[in-house]
Amino acid sequence: MNESEDNEMQIIITGGGGFLGQKLARALLQGPHPFTELLLVDIQQPQSPLPDPRVRCLRADLTEPGVADSLISERTAVVYHLAAIVSSHAEQDFDLGWKVNLDTTRTLLEACRHARPGIRFVFTSSLAVYGGPLPELVNDGTALTPTSSYGAQKAMGELLVNDYSRKGFVDGLVLRLPTICVRP
């Protein structure tokens, strides 16, 4: 990026209307991070967690052709890909689970690849990639043995991020999160 592009830095959060997306957006807005636009994208209209002119909220279906390409540009610095169908829903609706949890990940990676190399791509995975009970110590050598469609989708998403990173298309980071239950 050149200096003028640095002044036009965009951060995108998919799943920006969800629990994690809102927490992340708030942290970014309150932090020292230099950006000109924080784009919150969700299947339902997201809201900004704080009043800030840098925030743009967009209702969009990332499974629709062309949507990812319309969001990501040369000024995109970071994509936080938090959008997903949760485990039970991915089991109940096999096709939708694959479409949202894997196909959308690849579509976003492709949009980053074509916009410019090196966009930071943060993918939220899940401990479901390990399947049943976890060993006492989980490290990089722990085998991925998903026992659900959701776990398989997240494991394949991780492999995609790793491969796109290896090729220099994105600067990928995978975060394996535990189950997060949000209740009022």
Predicted regions and their residues:
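NAD(P)H-binding glycine-rich loop region in Rossmannoid oxidoreductase-like domains
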Residues: 62-100
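Active-site Tyr-X1-5-Lys
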Residues: 132, 147-173
